[in-house]
Design a protein with these regions (language model features):
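Feature marks short, highly hydrophobic, charge-poor N-terminal signal-anchor/signal peptide-like helices
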Residues: 1-6
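Glycine-/small-residue-biased sites that favor an extended, beta-strand-like backbone
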Residues: 7-157
């Protein structure tokens, strides 16, 4: 085999290795990015749970404040807050509304957490398919490189 053929086969081998290595790294990086995206989605979902609980706590605090104001207002008007049925019905309705609001706020947080989990799964799926695709292309690069080296060898060897 001539020096030219040996050099060409060597360059083809080096090129094949570089392409293979590059494609394998591409798959690893895609998987790493997917893991990062998934963890960010889960973090955002957990934050939504906290936000929902905070909104619910704020709503209860608002309800408590409103109740104190209402009691003071009715007492100022001379109405007996403890024995007046219409006032108690009003308070019960306000309490029911406040606690229904808090349930909705908490449920909204859990719904958003569920959506975040789906986004995390989707990110991991994208990463896995990108990695698999890169692995297939890397294997193809080795096969194509070996074929090219064999052609060069048979032509110039």
């Amino acid at each position: 085999m001539s020096f030219l053929a040996a050099g060409m086969v060597g360059l083809q081998g080096l090129g094949t290795f570089m392409k293979y290595s590059s494609l394998k790294r591409e798959g690893q990086y895609a998987m790493g990015a997917a893991q990062f995206d998934a963890s960010q989605a889960m973090f955002a979902g957990a934050q939504e749970i906290i936000n929902g609980e905070t909104r619910a706590n704020d709503r209860i605090a608002q309800f408590d404040s409103d109740m104190e104001s209402n009691i003071a207002l009715f007492a100022f008007k001379g109405r007996d807050v403890d024995s007046d049925a219409s006032i108690n019905a009003f308070f019960d309705k306000q309490k029911n509304i406040a606690y229904t609001d808090t349930s909705l706020m908490a449920n909204d947080g859990y719904i958003k957490l569920g959506q975040a989990k789906l986004r995390a799964k989707q990110a991991m799926y994208r990463g896995a398919t990108a990695k698999a695709s890169a692995d297939y292309r890397a294997t193809s690069a080795i096969i194509n490189g070996a074929f090219g080296m064999a052609q060069t060898w048979s032509t110039f060897g």
